[in-house]
Amino acid sequence: MNELKKPHILVCNDDGIEGEGIHVLAASMKKIGRVTVVAPAEPHSGMSHAMTLGVPLRIKEYQRNNRFFGYTVSGTPVDCIKVALSHILDDKPDILVSGINYGSNTATNTLYSGTVAAALEGAIQGITSLAFSLATYEHADFTYAGKFARKLAKKVLQQGIPADTILSVNIPNVPESEIAGVLSTSQGRSRWEENAIERNDMYGNPYYWLNGTLKLLDDSLRQDEYAVRRNYVTVTPLSCDLTNHTFLDSLNQWNLQK
């Protein structure tokens, strides 16, 4: 296939340009299209949809093994998408893929995720967008995740997804032979039970490390976090529209004008 006829794929993440997951994802996407990598210069996990205001953003080329790999932006994942579209890319991408994140982005974690936010920013800009996350924080093996990401990206390029919608994909950190299956799921319900650890600096002033445990509030295989814990790959459609449409009709009956 002529290089210019291949789909143009924008690759981003929130773990930063040196994160292993983005290198696996970029390599996988290069098998099906033209890849441009634009990622934060430093890790920005948990930044959600934050963007940089009042501070200049800087773009730099990034070398990997003495070869050009992509661009870094001195900002958040959302900054990367905005800057890529306005100052780096010559043509609009056919698809945006974000990840592969180090750690799951299911249930409540979806709201904190810079990986998911980068994909949502892509959708806001009218780009078909996917987010990929590996459900582990240690001993990560991105092999199957990269393979599945490529398979799903090809399917999405063929089938399309609705406007203002992304697919958030969470992949168990197990060998392919142990994957239980692939499920389309909804965003699960959970909350973090916080345990802020207090310590003192050398001057005796207290400081805090945020810590906690994710408490699952449902136990259905149609919810992403529960399914991932049982070795299912989950594919969850998320919308840029945060409106609770179910409650909106009831709210209209409140007669708020009086």
Swiss-Prot record:
Pfam families xref list: SurE
TM region(s), chain numbering: none
EC number(s) stated in the UniProt entry for this protein: 3.1.3.5
Entry's localization field: Cytoplasm
Predominant location category: cytoplasm
UniProt-annotated binding residues for a divalent metal cation: D14, D15, S45, N101
Keyword Nucleotide-binding: yes
Record bears the keyword Electron transport: no
Required cofactor names: a divalent metal cation
Keyword set, alphabetical order: Cytoplasm, Hydrolase, Metal-binding, Nucleotide-binding
GO terms for MF: 3'-nucleotidase activity; 5'-nucleotidase activity; exopolyphosphatase activity; metal ion binding; nucleotide binding
This protein's GO CC annotations: cytoplasm
Catalysed reaction, written as an equation: a ribonucleoside 5'-phosphate + H2O = a ribonucleoside + phosphate
Manner of cofactor binding, per the entry note: Binds 1 divalent metal cation per subunit.
Top-level division of the source organism's lineage: Bacteria
Similarity remark: Belongs to the SurE nucleotidase family.
Described purpose of this protein according to its UniProt entry: Nucleotidase that shows phosphatase activity on nucleoside 5'-monophosphates.
NCBIfam families: PRK00346.1-4, PRK00346.2-2, PRK13932.1, surE
Name of this chain's protein: 5'-nucleotidase SurE
Organism: Chlorobium limicola (strain DSM 245 / NBRC 103803 / 6330)
Gene for this chain: surE
